[in-house]
């Protein structure tokens, strides 16, 4: 089994990546392979509402020239998907939102192709707005008919400067619990 995570942060090794790696630690202990895809510095644009995904139904977005179709392929190949983002004005980063919108339309156009995969949101935040960002990701998972594991708290880590989340003991523990629960859920799905 495999989990792919998409880091929507502009900081490759910032708080969001630290939180994802805390989840990955537990997944790896359970024998689940992991892959982290950094959206930072990659070309990615929003949905153009062209509707071609519904016309062609080929598991691909018609917009070319960026990484979205590569990301969709990785999502299809994985058993679990983590979408991770810092909080930008009480929501996910624009790069992650573009991935959600475009992969979401492609999934709907192709018989909910992410159906019954495990999905988990991971949010880094300085102070406020994390719940809305968390909800944005979970709305994508739920409309895609994915299965979402819980944790001991919302999947949020607190910190401003890169590395600050390492001092949020409860946030790191929440990520570890999420990883253990995601591993358990994925094994149950595949029994």
Report residues per predicted region:
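N-terminal beta1-alpha1-beta2 submodule of the flavodoxin-like/Rossmannoid cofactor-binding fold
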Residues: 1-109, 159-191
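Short, glycine-/small-residue-rich phosphate/pyrophosphate-handling segment
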Residues: 94-95, 109-155, 173
């Amino acid at each position: 089994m495999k989990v792919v995570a998409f880091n929507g942060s502009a900081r490759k090794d910032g708080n969001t990546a630290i939180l994802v790696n805390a989840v990955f630690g537990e997944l790896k202990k359970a024998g689940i392979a992991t892959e982290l895809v950094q959206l930072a510095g990659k070309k990615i644009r929003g949905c153009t509402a062209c509707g071609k995904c519904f016309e062609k139904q080929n598991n691909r977005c018609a917009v070319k020239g960026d990484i979205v179709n590569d990301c969709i392929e990785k999502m299809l190949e994985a058993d679990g998907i983590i979408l991770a983002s810092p909080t930008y004005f009480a929501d996910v980063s624009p790069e992650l939102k573009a991935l959600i919108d475009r992969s979401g339309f492609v999934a709907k156009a192709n018989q909910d192709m992410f159906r019954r995969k495990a999905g988990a949101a991971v949010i880094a935040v300085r102070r406020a707005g994390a719940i809305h960002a968390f909800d944005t990701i979970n709305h994508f998972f739920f409309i895609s008919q994915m299965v979402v594991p819980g944790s001991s708290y919302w999947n949020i880590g607190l910190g401003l400067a890169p590395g600050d989340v390492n001092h949020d003991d409860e946030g790191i523990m929440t990520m570890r619990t999420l990883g253990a629960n995601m591993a358990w859920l994925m094994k149950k799905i595949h029994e």
